Each structure stands twice: as structure tokens, then as C-alpha cells.
């Protein structure tokens, strides 16, 4: 069915979001059109404000509205460990379990030879720079249990082991192919408690 141009454009915009197909995009577009002008304006303002005000922490790469982020400036955290994750959503998932008390490093992707993504294409150089001060004794790799997650963890291990840094991986309480952001808190807690050395 053909829709008027404004709604067709809105459907197209929604369908560009991850996990949103045409049917869901159409539903969201029609829902948005049915909202009050005030609610639509608030939605648009919040969207623009988030895009304008959020940045990536210059230390760890986490999404923040302050740079450096509140985690990196928290001196009560364990300075001897860094937990490496794929993206900022994974930091939030790990913080929910309230069991990990060190710092984080966000890669903003994974090494993916099949997709032409190499170590220089993700946020790895700044991790190595962070480790130069000698305070960190353990790096916990918390990438997803996928082929790309495994490739990334093995690369990190190969690079860091010669420097005498202990490199561990989350335990396999996480199902192969699963995303950390969707794991329940008990599973994440078990995975971090039973991590294995690489």
C-alpha cells in the first residue's frame, strides 16, 4: 500500500533502527502520528538532545554526558582490573549486577575477519595506552560468545600476555551466540565469578 510521502518517510526512518522491520516501523509511524503535538515535540527534543549532549568517554569509550565518565572518575573503583566490552550497552548490563568494581573499556565493535574489520578498526589502541602505567594486572574480556567475540578475545590475549597482564574471559554461563546486554543478572554474575584465564 502506498502511504502519503510524510508517513512513508517516517516509516523509512523507523525501519533503519536495528531490529525494526517494515511492519513494526509502520506501527511506530502511525502511533507517532496519533500522538499529541506536545508529545511529538518532547520526543523530538529528547532525541535531538541525546544526540547533541552524549559523547564517548575519552578514557574508556563509554557513552556519557560528562567527559571523562562517572565510572572513570570514581577513584573508589578497583584500579587493577579493566573489563573489556563490545559496546556501551554491555557496561550498563555489567553495572546492574553490582558485583564488578573495576573499570571498563568499550571497543565499539569486534574484530571480524569475514567482514573486513581488523584490530585497527575498533577501540584497541587506547586500551593498550591505558595499560602502560602498570596499575592494571588483569583484563577481563567480556565480548559476546560468537566467532567475532572469540577472535577479539584471542587477539587481546595475544597482545597483552607478553606484557605480563593476566587476561581472563567470562565463564560460559553465557550461551554461545548470545548477547551480554540480554543476559539476566544471575547469568552475568556467574559468568564474571567463574571467568577463565586465556
From Swiss-Prot:
InterPro entries (alphabetical): DNA_Rcmb_RecR, Rcmb_RecR, Rcmb_RecR_Znf, TOPRIM_dom, TOPRIM_RecR
One Gene Ontology term from the biological process aspect of the record: DNA repair
Zinc finger intervals, C4-type: 57-72
PROSITE patterns documented for this protein: RECR, TOPRIM
Gene3D superfamilies, per database record: 3.30.60.80, 3.40.1360.10, 6.10.250.240, RecR Domain 1
Pfam families xref list: RecR_C, RecR_HhH, RecR_ZnF, Toprim_4
Record keywords: DNA damage, DNA recombination, DNA repair, Metal-binding, Zinc, Zinc-finger
Domain of life: Bacteria
Residues covered by the Toprim domain: 80-175
GO molecular function, one term: zinc ion binding
DNA damage recorded as keyword: yes
Methyltransferase among keywords: no
UniProt cross-references to HAMAP family, sorted A to Z: RecR (MF_00017)
Function as written in the Swiss-Prot or TrEMBL entry: May play a role in DNA repair. It seems to be involved in an RecBC-independent recombinational process of DNA repair. It may act with RecF and RecO.
Family: Belongs to the RecR family.
Protein name according to UniProt: Recombination protein RecR
Organism of origin: Streptococcus pyogenes serotype M1
Gene from which the chain derives: recR
Amino acid at each position: 500500500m502506498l502511504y502519503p510521502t510524510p508517513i512513508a518517510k517516517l516509516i523509512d526512518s523507523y525501519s533503519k533502527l536495528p531490529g525494526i522491520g517494515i511492519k513494526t516501523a509502520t506501527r511506530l509511524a502511525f502511533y507517532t502520528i496519533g500522538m499529541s503535538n506536545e508529545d511529538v515535540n518532547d520526543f523530538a527534543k529528547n532525541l535531538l538532545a541525546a544526540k547533541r549532549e552524549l559523547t564517548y568517554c575519552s578514557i574508556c569509550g563509554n557513552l556519557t554526558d560528562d567527559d571523562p565518565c562517572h565510572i572513570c572518575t570514581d577513584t573508589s573503583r578497583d584500579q587493577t582490573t579493566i573489563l573489556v566490552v563490545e559496546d556501551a550497552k554491555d557496561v550498563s548490563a555489567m553495572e546492574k549486577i553490582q558485583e564488578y568494581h573495576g573499570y571498563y573499556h568499550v571497543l565499539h565493535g569486534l574484530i571480524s575477519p569475514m567482514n573486513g574489520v581488523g584490530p585497527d578498526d575498533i577501540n584497541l589502541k587506547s586500551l593498550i595506552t591505558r595499560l602502560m602505567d602498570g596499575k592494571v594486572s588483569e583484563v577481563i574480556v567480556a565480548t559476546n560468545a560468537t566467532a567475532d567475540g572469540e577472535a577479539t578475545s584471542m587477539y587481546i590475549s595475544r597482545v597483552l600476555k607478553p606484557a605480563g597482564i593476566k587476561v581472563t574471559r567470562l565463564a560460559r554461563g553465557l550461551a554461545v551466540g548470545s548477547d551480554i546486554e540480554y543476559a539476566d543478572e544471575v547469568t552475568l554474575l556467574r559468568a564474571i565469578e567463574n571467568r577463565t584465564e586465556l
